[in-house]
Amino acid sequence: MSRLPVLLLLHLLVSPGLQAPMTQTTSLKTSWAKCSNMIDEIITHLNQPPLPSPDFNNLNEEDQTILVEKNLRRSNLEAFSKAVKSLQNASAIESILKNLPPCLPMATAAPTRPPIRITNGDRNDFRRKLKFYLKTLENEQAQ
């Protein structure tokens, strides 16, 4: 008996035409699930002691505007990635931030203003702004 029919059958079984198709929606949902897990992990790290002062959640309007601007998402992530290096015990957050760029939406135009400013070594400033930034990403995906 020839091996040709067996090889042909094997080829048909592994060809993409016979496998369940992966839609773009399925792929995006899976990708976003990974992104959401990374965001949750960062927030868990941010919620660990030392805890911030009572006025922690006060984020000025200009910072909020910068953090929600879609064209600044990548620039803001770069600012957080640089700022995390000046914090103690933040290596876990730093490594997750490195994996976050694929989760960001594509910018539709060049940024019109500079990215967010984070006070060097100020864990509360970093935490407050990063939490707002991450929540913005989550809220946008939920829409």
From Swiss-Prot:
GO terms for molecular function: cytokine activity; growth factor activity; interleukin-3 receptor binding. Keywords: Cytokine, Disulfide bond, Glycoprotein, Growth factor, Secreted, Signal. It is found in: Secreted. One of its GO terms (biological process) is cell surface receptor signaling pathway via STAT. Glycans are attached at residue 89. The keyword Glycoprotein applies. InterPro entries: 4_helix_cytokine-like_core (IPR009079), IL-3 (IPR002183). Activated T-cells, mast cells, natural killer cells. Disulfide bonds join 35-103. The keyword Secreted applies. GO terms for cellular component: extracellular space. Residues 1-19 form the signal peptide. Belongs to the IL-3 family. Granulocyte/macrophage colony-stimulating factors are cytokines that act in hematopoiesis by controlling the production, differentiation, and function of 2 related white cell populations of the blood, the granulocytes and the monocytes-macrophages. This CSF induces granulocytes, macrophages, mast cells, stem cells, erythroid cells, eosinophils and megakaryocytes. Monomer. This is Interleukin-3. It comes from Macaca mulatta (Rhesus macaque). The gene is IL3.
